[in-house]
Amino acid sequence: MSLKYTCPSCGTPLGYEGLCWKCKCEQERQAALAWMPEQIVEKQRNLIQNIQRLADMEDPEFADFWQLLGYHDAITPEIQRVALAAEVFWPCEIYYHAPADVRDGLIHALLSAEYSSAASNLMSCLAMQGDDKAMETLLELERNPRPWRKGLYVDPSSYAQIGGWTFDKEGQRIRLGFDTCYPMVKGTTSEKSPVRISRAREDTCPHCGGRMVDMLVLDGRDERLKFLGLDGILTATCCPNCVGFLKGPAFNSFTLDGGVEVFPSELFDGAEKTDCYVSPEDYKALTENPFVLGEAPVPLFYGAACQDVNTVGGFANWVQDAEYTTCPHCGKPMKYLAQIQWDTVFDCAEGTLYVEFCPDCHIVSMQHQQT
């Protein structure tokens, strides 16, 4: 059955009149990116005056918060102090790199908490604040748990991961990401780019028989990518059909000259075979997508609240919880590298692929999350 309407911007068939959701998101993003300085100040002022509406996920405050943070890096200490005074502890990103007085207020609230739900929110906030005293507090709570710890699934070191860092048993800080972020933007398939999403391969998946794909090919020698510390090519290879059905992430090792060795994998249900749901048309769309690396860096949270943005570095838009893979070779946590939103590269796909890597062992992990 053919649909009655098409998106006036991109031509996607629709069952309603108007923009498709991706073009609508892009329109809203471009409008927010075009805010003048006085508009940003007005948005900040309104957020301060109505901070409780942020915790209640009410618009325009909720949308304004994410646009201020993600597109303008414009969450000020004043906003953070007002949020603390109002006991607004969600979204935790509001406290990213908050000043020392706000950090001390968060620590006081955490150490005074009686219930696991409050402690969970406050540890997330402290993870986003992220300085040495914040780490000392979470480390102390890991070594000497409070009664509310029994009501939580994970330790404080796992909460620290929300802020892009964690610590080991000796109390040494471990960084889990990068303080630089670049977007993937639409170019052309023939346009030269140091990052490519979804390069076709000839080999097939042992589980479903579908084509394997180099989901991310990244040349760290490009000046924009020097922050990654990769003096060569990283390739992340998996089966786009099966990566969401595996028992754990998909892994491969890479060599800086572009070589790849895919690790054996196991389906979540223990079966040897499964069906391939990715059609030839989907493979074509996937491997001929137009995305190229953007020319300029963007704020770290640029892609952290969007379902239509692919990014390298910065913070991910975790569909579920932040999840950092343990390197199968050295046992250390891997570093978050990139996110690929499936629906940006072929229609009607769900969820997000998160790419992480171990810079010491040259091993990549790819994991899928969806609602």
Language-model-detected regions and their locations in the chain:
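N-terminal targeting leader peptides, primarily classical Sec-type signal peptides for secretion
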Residues: S2-K4, E26
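Extreme N-terminus of proteins, especially the signal/transit-peptide cleavage junction
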Residues: M1-S2, A338
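Short Cys/His-rich zinc-binding micro-motifs
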Residues: K4-G15
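Long compositionally biased, domain-poor regions of proteins
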Residues: E17-G18, E26-T371
